[in-house]
UniProtKB/Swiss-Prot annotation:
Residues 14-81 form the HTH HARE-type domain. It comes from the Bacteria. It comes from Ligilactobacillus salivarius (strain UCC118) (Lactobacillus salivarius). The keyword Cell cycle does not apply. GO terms for biological process: DNA-templated transcription; regulation of DNA-templated transcription. This is Probable DNA-directed RNA polymerase subunit delta. Residues 119-196 are annotated as: Disordered.
Amino acid sequence: MELEKFKDANKDELSMIEVAHEILHQRGETMAFADLTNEIQVYLGKSDEEIRDRLAQFYTDLNIDGSFISLGDNVWGLRSWYPYDSIDEALVHGEDEEDEERPRKKRKKVNAFLADVSDDDDVIDYDDDDPEDEDLDNDYDDEDDDDDEGSHELKQYTKDLDDIDDGDDPEDELADGIEGQLTEFSDADLDEENQD
């Protein structure tokens, strides 16, 4: 296939997106992505490996470039062929034809706030009082009894502390070696030093 626009151009300098645009423009009809890629490969004379390496970037460029449009099923065309208002209609019309061939399933409407009789496990009934709430009310009376036991334990502990002898044990005193080296200062001694 010869492209008139690129007669004098060096094929090595052409991008795949430019060639794709010209192929679609010259043919005047939509093409599948695989067929379009094969046409580009033949025109540019590139190997399968070279095309495979550039394929992801080419597909990205097709999507990003505003002059191409995907018509579904990986079929591509030029956006200029479709008036702006008819683009949505053409796409929606294609979906409508498929819908006519197979009947649609009717979906059951679900209201999340209404309880379904068969699914009582999933529904939370906020009107019923929980048995745990009743248990809490009854436990307040029992806590008063616990306070009496706690105060008894406190009294026993205090008594045990009083029984401990606070007297000085001979073992607690240090040998005269360390205590003898310590000096006690009285306020009078400190006042004398400040006057000097």
